[in-house]
Each structure stands twice: as structure tokens, then as C-alpha cells.
Amino acid sequence: FSICEEQEYMPAIIYTTHAGPELGNAFADVISGRYSPAGRLAQTWYKSEYELAPIECYNIIENDMTYLYYKGKPLYPFGYGLSYAKFEYSDFDVRENGDVISVSLDVTNVSETDSDEVVQIYFRMENPSVKRPLRQLVAFAREHIKGGSKRHFEFDIKKSELRFYDVSRECFAVEQGRYTFMAGASSEDIRLTKTIDVSGEVIPPRELCKGIKAKNYDGKYGAKMKYSKKLEQHYMLGGGLIYNNCVLGDADSIEIVCGSRVNTGKITVRYGGKTLCEAEVKPTVDVTEFETV
């Protein structure tokens, strides 16, 4: 919802669903101060529809969408919500214990108002081998904390929650490296951070001599993925494809399985910023009648 102008003049905005016959009583309790709200947004609210990707573009990684990849300043971030109470975070500790990441912290209600607080734990990998989220929710807890009191929070996060899908090997993997963990009241309101080393796999390079499936790209521009019922597999149509972390080895030639719709086409292979080869692709009756060039 684009309510940029309204929120400049309103100290708070209550967002609710129909919520049933008790909505009126609940609403009255909130606006009168008898109850301190602690709802949190489960989505990112952008300032304008122009910040959204085209409706036919569903790839949130390429389009830097959702709280995972968005680099702008949203109207309201993922996990956001107001409260009548005020909380302070302290004593943040993060450790790797075997297959578990142990996280602990203290949260103090420094106001006189009793209220729930939703503690959110996010993480990101530093210098990943592929594009990873800027922050990713990995745990949260909602607890009632009386005014002036402190609550201790502990989270045991399975290390498998840090995994990503390695397209080069078509499997999930926890990559070895440095991970930053963040504790906050929303995806933008981060109060404490800590970076630790996490054991895992060293992602191996792509060995071109073993072949690469076109669909297992790291990035693309202008290309579309299609599916051939005849071949029972996906193929890429047009544009360009990017494959990172490749090893050419001692190869002296490259084979590409491809086809062209109507006109004679051309495929160019670049490696390390240099053009390795170019191949002419003759037109066929069916684009999925591939040939090796």
C-alpha cells in the first residue's frame, strides 16, 4: 500500500484484517492504550509501485526484490511494527556448536508499559560464491516483557538453515566462510550484530570438461527458460547466460548443443573477459531440434 503522504502526518497507522466479531473491542483496547500491539509485517511495503519489478518478472534475485535483496529504503520493512513500549537489546552472543548455531541475547523493557516484543534473528554470508540475500530471517520469538524487566532469549539454529542451492552441482550446501548474524526489531531495525566463522563446504569450480546444463546458470540477461515436452528437459532461448567459477583446463575445443528458430544464429563464448570462440547456428524446423556445433 502506497501511503507515503499519509504516514508523514500520522504518528501511527493501524493495519488490520476483518478479524471477526471482536475486532471492535480489540481496536478500542489498542487505541486507548489498554493493550500494547506487537504485530509485525510479513512483507515489505514499498514506497511506490514503480519500485516493483514488471509483473511477469518473478525472479526476486535478478530484480533485487523482497527484504532479502532489496537495496532501497522501503516505506515499511519486513518485520516492522510499532509498540507503546521501548526495548533495548544487549549481550549478543553467537557460536557454532557442531551442527547448531547457538544465539543468545538479553532484551530489556526500558519503559513502564508491559508489552510483547518480537525478537528477530537474521543472517547473511560475507563474500559468498554466488549472490546471496542481504539479510535472511532465520529465527524469531515473541515474548511478553513487563515494564522495567529483562528477558533472556536463546535460539538453537540448525546449521542447515544457512544452506543455499548450488546450481553447479544441483544440490543444497552450507558454504564455508564468515557469516554475520543480526538481532533486531525488524529487517531494517538491527540492534546487534556479530560475525563468526562457520565450517562447511568449499564450493568447487565448474569443470567444463564434464559439461554444463544451460539451465544451471548463475546469471542471465534477455534469456528465457523454456521446456520441451519432446526432449523432456529445459532449454534457454535467446539472450546471454553467465556461469561463474569455471575451469577450462586443457580443453582445446568446446561443444555446444543448440538450435535456431528461423534465421541463422550465432553463439559467442567468453571466458575471463575474452572471446574464446564463435559458432554459427543454422535454422531448423523446430527450435528444439538441437545440433552440436
Where does each model-flagged region fall?
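Secreted, periplasmic, or luminal enzymes acting at the cell surface/secretory milieu
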Residues: F1-D116, Y122, G147, E175-T195, ...
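Short aromatic-acidic-glycine turn motif
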Residues: L52-A53, F123-R142, T275-E278
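Short structured motifs
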Residues: E88-D93, L137-R142, D166-V167, G239-Y243, ...
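Solvent-exposed, conformationally flexible loop/turn segments
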Residues: G98, I145-K150, T284-V285
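Hydrophobic beta-strand positions in extracellular immunoglobulin-like domains
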Residues: V107-N109, I157, C258
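Conserved aromatic beta-strand anchor motif in extracellular beta-sandwich/beta-rich domains
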Residues: I121-N127, A183, V269-Y271
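Intrinsically disordered, low-complexity Pro/Gly/Ser/Thr-rich segments with frequent PxxP/GP/PP motifs
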Residues: S129-C171
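Extracytoplasmic
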Residues: Q176-T180, S187-V293
